[in-house]
């Protein structure tokens, strides 16, 4: 959310860090996440699409009031992406990557294929983006419960459902400021084992951001308007910093002679 991920990035190397912290009502569970991402927009194209690469190493902490506190490394992401400039301020991107298996209490116990389809409109200072994220786990049931344990009597196993997430962004820039609405939804796509209850949620919120020149800062707040089998509604505060580490120099304009023979 908050990024025009359908549009190709200008050639360069970028650091993006998204952090969020929230609490789920009813079960009094708090979750904190930080997602540092290194993105490289290359000078190459394939079929007219800009070739881009992304690496992410998320960290997660989970706390249940007066019960447990867990923290560790989430599944790292390795991905490649093609992003097309469709003209008239429209862009489309396709990402293919994988979240790698990680032996951690706060990670899925399986490698998953990750595909993302994004469409963005960026005309007249708008960012209108829809981003669909489709995850397919290679191992739906494992011998490590980790982030997602199976229901009894299989509590010592891990259940890793396939999933679909959809992120929506509708923001507009006003000078160096940006403001607008964001939303996301997620749902499990399959039942890994008998007795597993598929989870889903929908959340909406607002975003504000500011371009400080070398860095862009964003903040947004979301809250669930629908949830199923999560045990409560989630409210989360998000923050993001976008920092260009290097950008390709632009070619100087070709001078037009004032006099021709």
List each model region and its residues.
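Residues on the lipid-exposed face of transmembrane beta-strands in outer-membrane beta-barrel proteins
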Residues: 3-5, 17, 36-42, 78-84, ...
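Transmembrane beta-barrel domains of bacterial outer-membrane proteins
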Residues: 1-43, 50, 56-68, 101, ...
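Transmembrane beta-strands of outer-membrane beta-barrel proteins
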Residues: 13-15, 49-55, 92-96, 128-132, ...
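Transmembrane beta-barrel outer-membrane domains
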Residues: 27-33, 69-75, 106-112, 157-163, ...
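Loop-centered beta-sheet repeat module
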Residues: 94-98, 110-113
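Short loop/turn motifs that connect adjacent beta-strands in outer-membrane beta-barrel proteins
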Residues: 4-12, 26-28, 42-52, 66, ...
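Outer membrane beta-barrel transmembrane domains
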Residues: 20, 143, 147-261
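Sequence/structural signature of outer-membrane beta-barrel proteins
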Residues: 20-26, 58-66, 83-87, 97-106, ...
């Amino acid at each position: 959310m908050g990024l025009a991920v359908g549009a190709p990035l200008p050639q360069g190397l970028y650091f993006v860090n998204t952090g969020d912290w929230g609490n789920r009502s009813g079960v009094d569970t708090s979750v904190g996440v930080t997602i540092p991402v290194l993105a490289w927009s290359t000078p190459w194209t394939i079929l007219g699409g800009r070739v881009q690469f992304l690496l992410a190493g998320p960290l997660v902490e989970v706390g249940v009031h007066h019960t447990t506190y867990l923290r560790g490394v989430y599944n790292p992401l390795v991905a490649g992406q093609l992003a097309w400039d469709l003209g008239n301020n429209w862009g489309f991107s396709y990402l293919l990557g994988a979240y790698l298996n990680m032996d951690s209490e706060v990670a899925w116990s399986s490698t998953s294929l990750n595909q993302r389809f994004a469409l963005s409109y960026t005309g007249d200072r708008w960012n209108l983006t829809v981003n669909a994220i489709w995850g397919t786990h290679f191992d739906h049931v494992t011998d490590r419960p980790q982030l997602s344990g199976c229901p009894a009597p299989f509590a010592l196993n891990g259940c890793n459902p396939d999933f679909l997430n959809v992120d929506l962004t509708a923001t507009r820039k006003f000078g160096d400021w940006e403001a607008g609405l964001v939303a996301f939804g997620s749902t499990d796509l399959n039942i890994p084992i008998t007795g597993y209850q598929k989870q889903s949620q929908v959340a909406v919120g607002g975003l504000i951001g500011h371009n400080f020149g070398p860095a862009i800062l964003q903040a947004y707040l979301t809250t669930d308007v629908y949830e199923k089998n999560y045990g409560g509604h989630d409210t989360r505060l998000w923050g993001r910093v976008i920092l260009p580490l290097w950008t390709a120099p632009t070619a100087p304009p070709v001078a037009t002679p004032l006099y021709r023979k």
